[in-house]
Amino acid sequence: AAQPLRERKTWRQRVQQERLEYLGMLEFFTRHAQLRVPHVLAPVTAHYSWSKGLKLLGLGRSQLQLLPEQGMRLDTDALESTLEKCRRERQPVLMSVAVLGTTEYGTFDPVDGIVAARERAAALGLGHSVHVDAAWGGYLATVFRNEDGSLRSRDEVARGYHAFPAPEVHAAIAALADTDSITIDPHKLGHLPSGTGAFTRRDHRV
């Protein structure tokens, strides 16, 4: 049965007072010693700022698990096996990271494969988010969209280019709609002012 309004309000307040963002990392894990600090899974090609970010958040650099690459793209088999290991060991995962345009090579991680891995893991009880670091290559996604925002087919996009896009690039762009958050810096490929960079999130409450 639904709680009376007064009890519901009290319960919500109690929940809020136990949240990580209210207590802080140290107090939260002191109170809940049975819990483990979550991992962040990212490709070995990820920008060095990921290491910095985990330090600043207080999660710790050791929670950043760098996964191997295949052809300078995240190896999805390695991701799947890492997620399975985390599930078996009851190790929480905060997010898997895809890079859309690596700093050194401009390669796109298989976002579609990473999203599929998230869905399979979630079905087994290991829920986590997928974040796309599209700081470098995100602006290129505009080439793949019609004016109304709908996705253009690979053949439509390819008409304007000689050998672009590869099927895996189109699949990665198409899968952006299924991710949880994206960072983008249009001042790079878009030649726009630096202040146009953004962090976008599917859940607008964030």
Where do the PLM segments sit?
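Conserved PLP-enzyme active-site core in the AAT-like
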Residues: A1-H204
